[in-house]
Amino acid sequence: MALRANDASFTTNDQVISALNEQSQAHSEVISQIFSEISKSIVGQKDVVEKIMVALISDGHVLLESVPGLAKTLLAKTISEVLGVSTVRIQFTPDLLPADILGTKIYKKSSEQFDIEKGPIFNNFILADEINRAPPKVQSALLEAMQEKQVTIHGETFVLSAPFLVMATQNPIESEGTYKLPDAQVDRFAMKILISYPSIDDEKSIIARFASSNESLVNPVITSDKVIELQKFSQSIYVDESIINYVTRIVDATRNPQNYNLDLKNAIEFGASPRASLWLIKTAKALALIHGRGFVIPEDIKSVAHEVLRHRIILSFEADVNKISADQIIDTILENIQIS
């Protein structure tokens, strides 16, 4: 039986669920304050902000795809200020070197010895702007740091600060002078979030806000310690066996659509990896926590499915020719795969 918000027939100890709900609601109130503070600076984009928070709480990284000028830098800066963590923007260019990100050894004449000069990777929030403009060596250096949460500089290993979130951006339009991220490396991002243009009303609000002389300042709501606490607590959010079965069937449908009577085989070159199943569960837990629940419901899975799966489904040539997108495939799967 699936756990739902209005379902009293839990398949685990009711007291455990009740305690998780109580703690989740307390954490959710704090998270609501975070969203409220962010909205002082960021107009609209509520779903984008929520999904970035989902990635952060689930201890994952984000690939942001949007055209230039949609306030990605302001978004990263605002979120980091509200969370009381450090942030840095790294502009990826063809001449960037791994040492420019990680750091290097520098000879100090005064001490007559080499000292480690740490790079910008030693911040909590990293905005890797236009990651696909840097050569593969630089991309690999960043992606290894994302995976291991540590870097090695001239044989010396340094653990990165926690929390650690990389928000990498890429432009969906321009391809000249770019290096395509390998599919295996893209898979390391927990979520791929698409940022769209603001609505007319939101754009009016943006114009009015920038026309005003009053600067929208935000204040820290929590500290990095609280972020880590949220990350740890989200791991304890309850997931029913039926939810796990639901997730595995969704992911399997990207690999073997014919087993679910889905006519998608010719559109998919390769389906999602097992990492997709793990991130569907982890991000759904984070979303449940944000909404003040101590357990995951099917709607949580559906809500994060596009962001978790869209960059993990490798489309076939036929799909490209027929302009079939990964999101369309995910829509079809979600419409046909039901929880049991």
Give a label for each model feature:
Residues S66, D129-E130, A141:
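Walker B catalytic acidic pair
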Residues L20-S28, S41-I42, K192-L264, I290-G294, ...:
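Conserved C-terminal "switch" segment of AAA+ ATPases
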Residues E50-V54, Y107-L127, E156:
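Conserved alpha-helical scaffold flanking the Walker A/P-loop in AAA+ ATPase domains
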Residues Q23-L70:
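Pre-Walker A (pre-P-loop) alpha-helix and adjacent loop at the N terminus of AAA/AAA+ ATPase modules
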Residues R89-I121, S140, G177-V186:
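Conserved AAA+ P-loop NTPase core
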Residues A2-L20, S24, Q258-S340:
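C-terminal engagement/docking regions of AAA+ P-loop ATPases
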Residues K108-Q113, E130, A134, V138, ...:
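Canonical AAA+ ATPase core
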Residues L56-T93:
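Walker A/P-loop
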